[in-house]
Design a protein with these regions (language model features):
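...captures the hydrophobic TM-helix bundle architecture rather than a specific catalytic motif
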Residues: 1-220
Length: 220
């Protein structure tokens, strides 16, 4: 279980080191985000082969929100789709990190750039690995925040600053639809966990159809 939890945590550790100690490490600050993302890639490859061999994971770490019978946990799920997306995210992120070493060389914001990049990877992995809709929304919001920070990285330039603000505003439109969808799912199924929603979905849809006089088995 620890192996899977380290997939998002390694890039987050790289973000913390580059973000907190970047001004002391200078360009060496890039080593830590790169190591974290490459480490996440190696663990993602291992997770992929675990899934190929029949291993599936749906584990909760702790209860995030608990009100009466309703609870939302911080947990990760790894299935076939997740395993593939982990490979995609960590492969692309590793290549971008390595390429950026030369691309950003000499820039005064070098450590800050790699901190943002590692944080972006962390939130993307949270989005991919989340086992409930609320945690996935947190990952989505984090990706949106990091997109704003990266697009407006050279904030001294008006064009970059304006582009960052524009991206932030556009993402908020998507957030509104996301929040409505999550609320509708909760009102319909009484839970936000993927496994419980997907297990209840066929029954719920069938009941709605029958109430409207539609019989799926007769629609041939």
């Amino acid at each position: 279980m620890l192996k899977y939890a380290l997939i998002p945590l390694l890039p987050f550790a790289g973000f913390l080191i580059a973000g907190l100690f970047g001004k002391y490490l200078k360009e060496k600050a890039a080593y830590f985000p790169i190591a974290g993302v490459v480490g996440a890639f190696i663990l993602s490859v291992s997770a992929f082969f675990d899934v190929v061999n029949g291993v599936k994971l749906n584990e909760n770490f702790y209860s995030w929100i608990s009100i009466g019978t309703f609870s939302v946990n911080v947990g990760f799920q790894i299935d076939q789709l997740t395993a593939v997306m982990l490979l995609v995210v960590t492969t692309l992120s590793s290549l971008i990190h390595i390429y950026s070493v030369g691309y950003m060389h000499g820039d005064k914001g070098y450590p800050r750039f790699f901190a943002y990049l590692a944080l972006f990877t962390f939130f993307m992995l949270v989005l991919v690995m989340a086992n409930n809709f609320l945690l996935m929304f947190v990952g989505w919001e984090g990706v949106g925040l990091c997109s704003y920070l990266l697009i407006g990285f050279w904030y001294e330039k008006k064009s970059a600053s304006d582009a960052g603000i524009k991206a932030f505003v556009v993402n908020r439109v998507g957030d509104f639809g996301f929040v409505l969808a999550v609320l509708l799912i909760f009102l319909t199924f009484g839970t936000l966990d993927f496994s419980e929603v997907f297990a209840s979905a066929p029954t719920s849809v069938g009941m709605r159809h029958e109430r409207k006089g539609y019989r799926p088995e007769l629609a041939v």
